[in-house]
């Protein structure tokens, strides 16, 4: 048994449909930290680095109020990809031991997805990152892939091993390459 406070500290979860508050982008990304940006200006530098790692910084700098931009309830002023990347930045800023991305790159183009995944490989060394995805390209550099069907584990291995196996993973991979 783990105390709930430990789980909250050690696990970050980014769902496909994430939640943003009616607040500024900087406060949305910093949400969950113990210190507020107003109390500790150094947090803004960390927010900006997390935004860069999540490939949302350039978009934010293009907004008239940059990090002070109000996003509206549930992030209505942002695109789906911008919402997902803002939530990924929030999780990266928390720097948990375990990061779970639950199809949270689905609204991001493949080039941006690739850059985010490269950044994750650099920034999350020595930590556990679980990526749940329907797009096989998201999983190409994974250490291990678990394929689930009807809630059951049907295949497990490296991406290369699963391609060689010629099962469901390989079939979907070939279909998605077309």
List the model feature ranges, each with a label.
Residues 5, 11-15, 130:
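ABC nucleotide-binding domain signature
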Residues 126-133:
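Conserved H-loop
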Residues 62-66, 103, 118, 122-126, ...:
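C-terminal portion of ABC ATPase nucleotide-binding domains
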Residues 110-112:
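Helix N-cap at the start of a conserved alpha-helix in ABC-type nucleotide-binding domains
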Residues 10-19, 74-75, 136:
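ABC ATPase nucleotide-binding domain signature
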Residues 79-80, 86-91, 131:
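ABC ATPase nucleotide-binding domain "signature" region
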Residues 93-97, 126:
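A short, proline-enriched helix->beta-strand linker immediately N-terminal to the Walker B motif
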Residues 1, 8, 26-73, 117-118, ...:
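ABC ATPase nucleotide-binding domain helical subdomain, centered on the C-loop/LSGGQ "ABC signature"
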């Amino acid at each position: 048994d783990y105390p709930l406070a430990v789980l909250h500290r050690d696990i970050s979860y980014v769902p496909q449909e994430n939640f943003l508050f009616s607040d500024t982008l900087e406060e949305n990304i910093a949400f969950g930290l113990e210190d507020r940006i107003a109390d500790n200006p150094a947090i803004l530098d960390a927010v900006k680095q997390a935004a860069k790692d999540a490939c949302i910084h350039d978009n934010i700098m293009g907004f008239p109020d940059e990090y002070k931009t109000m996003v509206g309830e549930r992030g209505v002023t942002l695109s789906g990809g911008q919402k997902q990347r803002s939530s990924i930045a929030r999780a990266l800023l928390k720097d948990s031991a375990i990061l779970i991305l639950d199809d949270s790159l689905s609204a991001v183009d493949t080039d941006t997805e690739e850059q985010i995944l490269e950044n994750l490989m650099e920034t999350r060394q020595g930590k556990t990152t679980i990526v749940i995805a329907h797009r096989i390209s998201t999983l190409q550099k994974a250490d291990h892939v678990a394929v689930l069907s009807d809630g059951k584990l049907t295949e497990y291995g490296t991406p290369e091993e699963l391609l060689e196996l010629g099962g469901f993973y390989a079939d979907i991979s070939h279909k998605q390459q077309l």
